[in-house]
């Protein structure tokens, strides 16, 4: 087994040969390399597959052997200082290796078809392969300085991939925003690393954990200083994992190609922050004040992300806010000491979210022939709808990913999210209430995404629409072919207008007898008559979706109890994941309340599933198709009749919708306070530099010039003038000197 561990350092290096080969090919034989560009996908996938096989072997060894292996090389600079670097293989490392390689391979396969017509195909594969290499290096690092090195490489790759289409101003701005926001966290991370090096004289994890186990409980060091340094480390995780208040870069990161959005949100960049916190949890758990702060940040993030996802029109931005919310759940779990639940949700969420993002890419790919190659149109859910009959395979996989994220059993995220909810209730009712309420919101906004995309009719064709036969699609009504007369059409149409609002908008009521006089519903693009419809993507893009579907269906089984064990006179239900994580959990005392019996699990499961079903129910009422059972019962019409006039409740709804759609005005606040504030400070500094500093210097020079101009007339070449001034200066000298 140790022989296998000795070669674990090869895993991060495996994707490098193809990166170097593509680079040399573009430099030496660019024409041939570009002509044969599709060939380069195969070695990229092959080498990452070898890394995956190696990672699986290491994971099996970890599960069977339950050991931690670390190998170090020492570089002695002088007698007082030496730099150690190496690799660490433990359960956390093996989990992340499998996660990165499996999702990375599927994204590479998907990208081969998705990016096939893009001029930057080779550049994309170079970036994404280097992204995988950087993340693999990050998770195998044995000390903080190595983590920081690969941390920066991950940030650089994300910058390049988010701004992949850099000719688009929005994409260029998005990558700059991600870069600057992450610099805040990276600066904190660097300060924290330097602080702990000053305290311990080492950057190795074993030395930091020694502090946690021995020095801090015995007041061996200044706990306030340690808490400050640990907080700075946490700040790096906050920025990387898009936690409040450094979450603003994540939705804008959707300007990159969809495959990289899947990789960032599933297994690489946003997972790096959670990984760092999980790696250092034996240190953090000895600082109760910081742990409470971590759980608070996670709670705020999970709720904020869910509320901001309620009214988004862009399918990828909606999923981005969903990622932000789910990362908040993981951060909450780590903050309350539920190490296993956090990693379990990291695994299940990664595969479910990769499935959703690649599914959204398939939807975007199918919409582009209709609306053009513009993200503002192809990603706009207002223009979708009814895609279930055009892309049935994508629809099925997307639905499974949606239900998984909603927490519907037996899909993957149900098992992990339910464990987090249970532990949060045991830790604090406040956290439990917010986490449970957000679980219902998650079901609402995720099913909203599904309904707007796949349910109803294809709305892009409702252009210059009229109910008369002169209309382009006169036979298809926005409210269905046969709607009960009792249904208020305005209520249904309100979900189509005003950006597919989260709440119904107050639109003047149309009497039933004016059905044939309904005005047009138009979109500003496309031909008046078109018979182009979306179509299913190719097998190369569907294959990763089907594999991820299998993961979504069955990966939750690693957290299902299969045996009972006894520890400290308590019955513990063992799972594959708990057996896998045993060496890591032994480094610290995990929350003792995390073990619950079958009855408690069933009670909690019924509660969480009920919340999810209620969220699905509400979403179906608001965004279901015109054939909705509730519409036929005049349910919506009864809601409208209760408030026929504009009321205070309508104003509240509009305010909430506006707040959600405008991202809580957080970006606006940052723009006003930080961007404009710094710009005005720069202008003031520029004015002071030019007006005051340069003014003084230029004034001295100008004064010298003027004095020189006056004095030069004294030297006219006459000896009498020279003698006169000479005698004057001598007289003054003799007069003042005694």
From Swiss-Prot:
Catalytic activity: a plastoquinone + NADH + (n+1) H(+)(in) = a plastoquinol + NAD(+) + n H(+)(out); a plastoquinone + NADPH + (n+1) H(+)(in) = a plastoquinol + NADP(+) + n H(+)(out)
Enzyme class: translocase
GO BP of this protein: ATP synthesis coupled electron transport; electron transport coupled proton transport
Chief subcellular location: plastid
Keywords carried by this UniProt record: Chloroplast, Membrane, NAD, NADP, Plastid, Plastoquinone, Quinone, Thylakoid, Translocase, Transmembrane, Transmembrane helix, Transport
Subunit structure: NDH is composed of at least 16 different subunits, 5 of which are encoded in the nucleus.
Purpose of the protein: NDH shuttles electrons from NAD(P)H:plastoquinone, via FMN and iron-sulfur (Fe-S) centers, to quinones in the photosynthetic chain and possibly in a chloroplast respiratory chain. The immediate electron acceptor for the enzyme in this species is believed to be plastoquinone. Couples the redox reaction to proton translocation, and thus conserves the redox energy in a proton gradient.
Protein known as: NAD(P)H-quinone oxidoreductase subunit 5, chloroplastic
Organism name: Saccharum officinarum (Sugarcane)
């Amino acid at each position: 087994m140790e022989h296998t561990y000795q070669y674990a350092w090869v895993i991060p290096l495996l994707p490098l040969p193809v990166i170097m080969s593509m680079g040399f090919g573009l430099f030496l034989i660019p024409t041939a390399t570009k002509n044969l560009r599709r060939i380069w996908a195969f070695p990229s996938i092959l080498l990452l597959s070898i890394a995956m096989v190696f990672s699986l072997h290491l994971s099996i060894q970890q599960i069977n052997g339950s050991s931690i292996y670390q190998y170090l090389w020492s570089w002695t600079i002088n007698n007082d200082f030496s730099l150690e670097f190496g690799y660490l293989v433990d359960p956390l490392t093996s989990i992340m290796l499998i996660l990165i390689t499996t999702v990375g391979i599927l994204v590479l396969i998907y990208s081969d078809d998705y990016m096939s017509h893009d001029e930057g195909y080779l550049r994309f594969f170079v970036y994404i392969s280097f992204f995988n290499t950087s993340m693999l290096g990050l998770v195998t690092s044995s000390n903080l300085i190595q983590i920081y090195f690969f941390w920066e490489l991950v940030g650089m790759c994300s910058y390049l991939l988010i701004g992949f289409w850099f000719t688009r101003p929005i994409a260029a701005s998005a990558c700059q925003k991600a870069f600057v926001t992450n610099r805040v966290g990276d600066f904190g991370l660097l300060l924290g690393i330097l602080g702990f090096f000053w305290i311990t004289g080492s950057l190795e994890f074993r030395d930091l954990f020694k502090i946690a186990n021995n020095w801090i409980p015995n007041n061996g060091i200044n706990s306030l200083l340690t808490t400050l340094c640990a907080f700075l480390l946490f700040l790096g995780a906050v920025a990387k994992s898009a936690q409040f208040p450094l979450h603003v870069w994540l939705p804008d990161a959707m300007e990159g190609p969809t495959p990289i959005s899947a990789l960032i949100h599933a297994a690489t960049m946003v997972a790096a922050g959670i990984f760092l916190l999980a790696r250092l949890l034996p240190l953090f758990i000895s600082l109760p004040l910081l742990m409470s702060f971590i759980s608070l940040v996670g709670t705020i993030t999970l709720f904020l992300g869910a509320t901001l996802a309620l009214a988004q029109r862009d399918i990828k931005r909606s999923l981005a806010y969903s990622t932000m919310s789910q990362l908040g759940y993981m951060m909450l779990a780590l903050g309350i000491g539920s190490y296993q639940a956090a990693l379990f949700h990291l695994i299940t969420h990664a595969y479910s979210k990769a499935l959703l993002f690649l599914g959204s890419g398939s939807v975007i790919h199918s919409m582009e022939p209709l609306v053009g190659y513009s993200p503002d149109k192809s990603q706009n859910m207002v223009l979708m709808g009814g895609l279930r009959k055009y892309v049935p395979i994508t629809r099925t996989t997307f639905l499974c990913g949606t239900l998984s994220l909603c927490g519907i059993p037996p899909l993957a995220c149900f098992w992990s999210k339910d464990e987090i909810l249970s532990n949060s209730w045991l830790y604090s009712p406040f956290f439990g209430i917010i986490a449970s309420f957000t679980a219902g919101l998650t079901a609402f906004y995720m099913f909203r995404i599904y309904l707007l995309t796949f349910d109803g009719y294809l709305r892009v064709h409702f252009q210059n629409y009229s109910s008369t036969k002169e209309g382009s699609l006169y036979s298809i009504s926005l409210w269905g072919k046969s709607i009960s007369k009792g249904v208020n059409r305005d209520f249904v149409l309100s979900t189509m207008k005003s950006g597919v609002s989260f709440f119904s908008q107050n639109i003047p009521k149309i009497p039933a007898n004016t059905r044939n006089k309904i005005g047009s519903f138009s979109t500003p693009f496309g031909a008046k008559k078109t018979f182009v419809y979306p179509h299913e993507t190719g097998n190369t893009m569907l294959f990763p979706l089907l594999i991820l579907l299998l993961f979504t269906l069955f990966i939750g089984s690693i957290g299902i109890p299969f045996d009972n064990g006894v520890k400290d006179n308590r019955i513990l239900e063992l799972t594959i994941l708990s057996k896998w994580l045993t060496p890591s959990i032994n480094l610290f005392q995990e929350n003792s309340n995390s073990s619950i019996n079958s009855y408690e699990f069933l009670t909690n499961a019924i509660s969480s599933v009920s919340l999810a079903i209620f969220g699905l129910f509400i979403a179906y009422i608001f965004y279901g198709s015109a054939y909705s059972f509730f519409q036929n019962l005049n349910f919506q019409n009864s809601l409208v009749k209760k408030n026929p006039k504009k009321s205070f409740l309508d104003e509240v709804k509009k305010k909430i919708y506006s707040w959600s759609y405008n991202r809580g005005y957080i970006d606006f606040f940052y723009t006003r306070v930080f961007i404009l504030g710094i710009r005005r400070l720069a202008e003031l500094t520029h004015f002071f530099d030019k007006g005051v500093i340069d003014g003084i210097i230029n004034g001295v020079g100008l004064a010298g010039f003027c004095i020189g101009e006056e004095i030069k007339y004294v030297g006219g070449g006459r000896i009498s003038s020279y003698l006169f001034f000479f005698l004057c200066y001598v007289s003054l000298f003799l007069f003042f000197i005694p």
